[in-house]
Amino acid sequence: MKKILFISLLSLLSCKRNNPVHPPVGGVLSQNDLDVSKNRMKNLNTVERQQIQDWITSQNIKFFPTQLNYWTTVDGFDKRERRPDESTISYSYDLYDFDQTKIYDKSISRNDARFGHFDELKAVENALRYMQNGEEVTLLVPSSLAYGTYGDENKIDNDIPLIIKLKVL
């Protein structure tokens, strides 16, 4: 009887599999996970840039690339004088998809936002630094500079490039 119990216990222990260990949310990822993520984003960015370029060629408005990887309707846009940190700005913008369908009925606006202290889309914050009071520009923004891989958890899905019509008030 002891032999049967011993053999049963031994066979049970030998069947145990090592479950993969997943890092906690916000935890540290392995180098392989980081490489996979980096390659995915690089490939997605390449595809989106080509799609945006194709869209631009079908438009009668000229768009110009910026150093941060978005396009604007102003030539030499990011060569202008840059607004400094701590300066304030009031602005509004509307979001569109590339079918030119407005995503939200109401404009998103902020009054007296301070550079370096407000949470905004990377492309919007960067563009605002180069805009003049009363100026309006249109931005073509890849998803990595918009709402990225998670979307806005409302109307904007993950990995969606956007058209942003931005105005300094």
Predicted regions and their residues:
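Sec-dependent bacterial lipoprotein signal peptides
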Residues: 1-16
